[in-house]
Regions:
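Glycine-rich phosphate-binding active-site loops on the catalytic face of alpha/beta enzymes
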Residues: 1-12, 58-75, 123-136, 172-193
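Hydrophobic faces of well-ordered beta-strands that scaffold small-molecule active sites
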Residues: 2-4, 31-35, 67-69, 99-103, ...
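Charged helix-capping and loop-helix junction motifs
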Residues: 15-21, 46-54, 79-87, 111-117, ...
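C-terminal helical cap(s) of enzyme catalytic domains, especially alpha/beta-barrels
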Residues: 16, 20, 140-148, 170, ...
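Glycine/small-residue-rich loop that forms an oxyanion/phosphate-binding "nest" at active or ligand-binding sites
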Residues: 16-83
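Catalytic cores of alpha/beta
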Residues: 43-58, 106-121, 145-157, 161-179
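Hydrophobic, well-structured mid-protein blocks that either form specific transmembrane helices
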Residues: 60-113
Length: 204
């Protein structure tokens, strides 16, 4: 599947309506758009949150099989009320939609508690680097989340995931991985890297 976002230098932001329409028209594999109104922190004001509600509704009603969100409150905890509202909007429009909580988790307080809150809210997946700069550095927390909490929501390692380390992350018990599949921050997706990653995953 593809996580679709704009604003790559900012860590990903909500793609435009035109890009969403194009994705529906031309992409044959599952596409999960990100809903994030701006770069920076993950605590949003009322106007930003209102735009997120509208974007979640739009994406869910367009027929995308999943989407990606993440909100923290001013204290640095998962914003349970706002996340619950967004999940409710998405699943009212599409009851089977899969919802991933993105790397806002890596800035959250008390990661075990945060993970348990995401499970209670009903998130499908968690994208995380284990609260470290990259997934290999955060492998201890990733492993703990997977093994101690039944991998529900599914823990998806992300952050500098490459063909030469993906096997180590899969060995932790991960059933999903996330990679930009680029050779540098200034280049686009590299098909060869995608192929190598896919081969590693399918070999498990």
């Amino acid at each position: 599947r593809i996580e679709l976002c704009a604003g790559r230098p900012e860590g990903g932001t909500t793609p435009s309506l035109g890009v969403l329409i194009s994705a529906i028209d031309v992409v044959s594999i599952p596409v999960f758009p990100m809903v994030r109104p701006r770069g920076g922190d993950f605590n949003y004001d009322d106007l930003e949150y209102a735009s997120m509600r509208d974007d979640v509704h739009t994406i869910a009603t367009m027929g995308f099989p999943g989407l990606v969100i993440g909100i923290l409150n001013s204290a640095g905890d998962v914003d349970i009320d706002r996340c619950a509202t967004l999940l409710g909007i998405a699943r009212a429009a599409n009851p089977t939609i899969e919802v991933t909580f993105h790397r806002a988790f890596d800035e959250a307080n008390e990661p075990i508690r945060a993970y348990q809150q995401l499970a209670a809210l009903g998130f499908t997946r968690l994208l995380t680097s284990g609260q470290e700069p990259d997934a290999m550095a955060g492998s201890a927390l990733i492993s703990e989340l997977i093994t101690a909490h039944a991998n529900s929501p599914a823990v998806m390692p992300g952050g500098s995931v490459r063909p030469d380390n993906v096997d180590k992350l899969l060995a932790l018990g991960a059933t999903n991985i996330h990679s930009s599949a680029t050779r540098s921050s200034n280049t686009g997706v590299d098909a060869a890297i995608v192929g190598q990653l896919a081969a590693s995953v399918h070999a498990v």
